[in-house]
Structures are given as structure tokens and as C-alpha cells.
Amino acid sequence: MELLNGGTKESDWSSLRPSIPLFHYSNIPVAERGHWLFSRRADFWLACGGASIGLLAAILLILLRGDRELDAIDFVLSELHLGATYHAIIRRRLWHHRRVDVLLIPLAILMLTYAFSLGGQTILLTSIAMYAAVWHRGRQSLGVARFYQRGMGGPVSRTHEVLFCGAIYLPMLAAVLAYTQLAPGEYEGEPYVALSVGAEITWTVGLGAVLWVIAYFAWTLRQSRADRVTLTPGKTEIRIHPGEWWVVLAHGVAFGSSYVLGASNVSFLLVLAVHHEVQYLYFTYAMSRPAGFHDGSRTGMEPAINRSGVQSIETRRRFQAELRHATTFAVWPVIGFAGACAGGWFDLAWLAPLGTGGLFCHYWLDGRIWTRRSLNA
């Protein structure tokens, strides 16, 4: 039996670990500690949807009380979500470095949206909105999981890469086919073009997605146990970041539940929407923080400083800096929310295509501004 920490048996170590809280600093492997957006605990709940616990709780809320509260939350977060995208573009001056991606193509999208709307192509617009939303939300999960994966040096192997990509894309495909099979007539109350391939293929793809995700977690668990080798006391190396598989788990639960249940009750689509918006706001805020913020706060659980006075001063300084940054970050999300409220209040017919076009522009921009090229611009 393998010995850990200079003489502790693996069975003895396992019996001791439950007494240490999951998010305690001493429970975080050294290789993992520098690769969180904020901290292990915060990332678990906000970036990873509580590893799907939050998603299941939201579904329970709809079953017990309806979707009134969730609908209001979705409206607020969706507009803040759009504003966060504009904040990222302006803060990084992408309108100057990448004019085609952030100016010309969004302008073309708006013009086409207006043309389709004025031409009565509402079914086409609804269809685009449906399929683009699936792609956009799924790719966001991929991007957040990639953040953790690259922090550990990238995929462990070709097998890891294939299993990981399949665990993201297959639930997306299965969700689309399930929704179009169960609700071929309407999407969010509007007619659309359903991608129907038949019940047999739909359920085959669904079963394949479930088995693929199970295979990903089985391989990840096995790999993590094999790689968890203690080099010296207190220094444990891992090669697969837990944030990666937390995101994959939340992604699978979100798509597997929201689109299947959403076929009979559109309210369940709000669960995925709210999860997506919270994750995006959290990620964009974390990425917008100055580099100095990350040096001592990414784990969120540093050892106590011996001198309590120094610790108190440092904590106060960090809080003040965080508050200033949060205020700056909130400007564009608040502007976006205020604009949406004003548009709804004026109720002008010509603004309706602008809202749809703005959504399509957001989908496009989110796929462009978080690439390596954009981040290095």
C-alpha cells in the first residue's frame, strides 16, 4: 500500500481527510492554488453553478412557486450580462485593435436583423435565436472549463482532450434534438424551424451523451487518483483542475434538464439562462481585475498572518480596492440595464429589432473577445 506524507498509509489519510473542510486552504493541492478566478469556494458556487446544486435548486423553485422570481432575475441579469460585454470591449480598447470583429460585423448583424424583421421573417429570427443560444451557452461552458484546464498546462493527453470536448458538445447536441423532438412547434412561445431527426436518433444521441459524460468523469477520477502523488509533505501535484470537471458537471445537468423540461414548460429554460448569466458576470468581473488582485486572493484562503495588525490593514486595503473596481465594472452593466428599461417604457416598435439584433451581436462578440488573440491585444 502506497505511503503518503512520509509514512501515513493511504487508508489512514482517507480517514483523516473528511475532518478537513472541502474548501480549507490545507485541502487545496499546491499545483491548484494559483489557478482560481477568485477562490475555490467562490468558483464552485458561481462559476460552476455549485457543481449543479444551484441548477437543481432553481428547478425545484419553479416546481414549487412558479417562475415569477426567476423571470425577474433573468431580466436583470441578462441586461447586466450584455453590459459586461461592452465593458470588456471598452476597457481593453478592442474597438481600436479589432475593428472588424467588434464594429463592422456587429453593424452588419444589426442591419440584417432589421431587414429580416421588416421583411416579416420572424420564424427565421426565432430559429436563429434558438440555435445560437444553445451554441453560445455551451461554448461559454467550454471557455470557462478551458480557463482551468490551461492553468494546469492544458489537456493531460489526447484522450483527455477528446473526452472533454465530447462531454461539452454532445450534451449540447442532445439538448437541441430533444427539444426539437418534444416541442417542434414553438420556442419561447414563437414558431421556429425545428431540427427533427426522429425519435430513435434523438434518444440514441441522448444516451450517447450520457455515456460519454460518464466516461469523462470515470477517466478523470482515475487519472486524478493516479496523478495525486505527494512529492514532499504538504505538496500534492495534480494535473486535472477540479474546476474543469465542476464546469462539465454543471454543463451536463443544465443542458440535460433545462431543454428537456423546457419543451413542456418554457420556464425551465430560465434555469439555464440564469446559470449562464451568473457564470458570465462572475468570469468577466474576475478577468477584469488588475493583475495585482490575483497575487494573494486567487485561493481566497491564505495562511493567517502572524501580526494581526498587518492583516487588518491589508484586508481593509484589499476591500477598498475591490470596492473601487466593482464600482467601475458596474458602470456599463448598469447602463445596459437602464437602456433596456427605457426601451420597454417607451415601447417603440422600431426598437424591437434592435433588442433582437443586440442579442445576436452579443453572441458574436462573446465568441470573439475572449480568444487568445483578443486577450493579448
Set out the residue ranges of the language-model regions:
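Alpha-helical transmembrane segments
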Residues: A42-A58, L104-L110, A167-M172, W332
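Loop-centered beta-sheet repeat module
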Residues: P171-V247
